[in-house]
């Protein structure tokens, strides 16, 4: 019953069907008001009226259900599952979108205790090959994304997919007890805006810090030395602040616009530090072009490392091996 209740809560189908059913009850009354000759109300018994309305309602409901499921079959579900020490739970899905899913489980790819430049490169190539192959075979024009893994992989994954296709994102809600997949709401109820600050030091390296899950102050950048910094953060931070489709898309638009307003000609290196949700990282990768935007070095963060940003992937490097920026050969404490 719990799964049925969740489906009814999440799906628009039953609401539309119920509304149509209620309206059809009033068909005889509408016919009488409009003086339609189709219904001879004096000759029709109550039983006949109920039968006509019931049959008509069932036909409409069945047609809508068929259309609903045929429409959903245009979706391809992108499931990213993989980060050391974490794995998405094996949920039995209640949502009909899953009838069209193509899961890409990356959990086995990304687990590597050594984390050398070679192992990161091999993991990236395997992910790239997996998603590229399935994407080329895929005839879907709509995609649904959910999951999490290392930030650089999420960003590069977003760049693999065309921006002219429709994407929908689920959010992985994590509590002390469980991790579950939830649909984003259409609109957010609370006010939470992005604010930005540009710190100019006339340096050749620019760091762009995006913080919605943690505050910017907690993102230590001392290992990079003196740099120019663009900070983009939300008034309220936390894992659940991006709780709606509108907020996800609006914030993505704002972040991309603020990044593109920068005079990139001044900088020889641009570093992206993203402390935000997996779906936001994926969309930023999709929105920031490999052709027209500059080369971004997207860093992985590890709170247990001696240096919190131990490695990165570069977005525009043609050679995949050159994409991997591995900073500390002797640092195995992460």
Identify the function of each model-found stretch.
Residues 2-71:
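Hydrophobic, helix-forming membrane-interacting segments
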Residues 126-135, 248-268, 280-283:
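A short, acidic, amphipathic alpha-helical segment used as a generic capping/interface helix at domain edges
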Residues 41-153, 162:
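N-terminal topogenic membrane-targeting module
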Residues 263, 267-300:
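C-terminal structured domain segments
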Residues 135-178, 281-284, 289-291:
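Hydrophobic, ordered structural segments
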Residues 80-85, 145-150, 209-214, 273-277, ...:
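Structural motif
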Residues 166-194, 235-242, 295-321:
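Long, charge-dense
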Residues 190-257:
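Redox- and metal-dependent alpha/beta enzyme cores, enriched for Fe-S-associated oxidoreductases
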């Amino acid at each position: 019953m719990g799964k049925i209740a969740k489906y009814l809560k999440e799906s628009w189908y039953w609401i539309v069907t119920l509304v149509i059913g209620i309206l059809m009850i009033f068909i005889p009354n509408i016919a009488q008001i409009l003086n339609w000759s189709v219904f001879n109300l004096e000759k029709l018994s109550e039983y006949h009226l109920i039968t006509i309305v019931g049959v008509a309602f069932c036909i409409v409901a069945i047609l809508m259900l068929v259309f609903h499921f045929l429409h959903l079959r245009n979706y391809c579900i992108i499931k990213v599952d993989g980060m050391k020490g974490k794995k998405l739970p094996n949920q039995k899905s209640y949502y009909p979108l899953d009838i069209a899913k193509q899961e890409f489980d990356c959990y086995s790819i990304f687990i590597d205790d050594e984390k050398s430049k070679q192992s990161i490169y091999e993991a990236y190539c395997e992910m790239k090959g997996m998603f590229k192959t399935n994407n080329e075979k895929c005839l879907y024009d709509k995609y649904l994304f959910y999951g999490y893994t290392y930030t650089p992989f999420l960003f590069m994954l977003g760049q693999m997919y065309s921006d002219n296709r429709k994407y929908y994102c689920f959010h992985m809600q994590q509590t002390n007890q469980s991790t579950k997949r939830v649909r984003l709401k259409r609109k957010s109820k609370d006010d939470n805006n992005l604010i930005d600050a540009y710190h100019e030091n006339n340096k050749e390296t620019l760091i762009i810090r995006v913080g919605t899950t943690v505050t910017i102050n907690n993102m230590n950048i001392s290992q990079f030395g003196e740099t120019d910094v663009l900070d983009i953060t939300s008034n309220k931070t936390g894992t659940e602040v991006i709780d709606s489709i509108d907020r996800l898309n609006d914030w993505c638009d704002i972040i991309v616009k603020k990044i593109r307003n920068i005079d990139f000609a001044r900088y020889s290196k641009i570093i992206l530090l993203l402390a935000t949700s997996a779906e936001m990282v994926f969309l930023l990768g999709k929105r920031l072009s490999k052709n027209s935007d500059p080369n971004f070095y997207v860093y992985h963060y590890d709170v247990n490392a001696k240096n919190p940003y131990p490695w990165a992937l570069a977005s525009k490097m043609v050679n995949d091996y050159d994409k991997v920026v591995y900073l500390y050969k002797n640092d195995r404490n992460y």
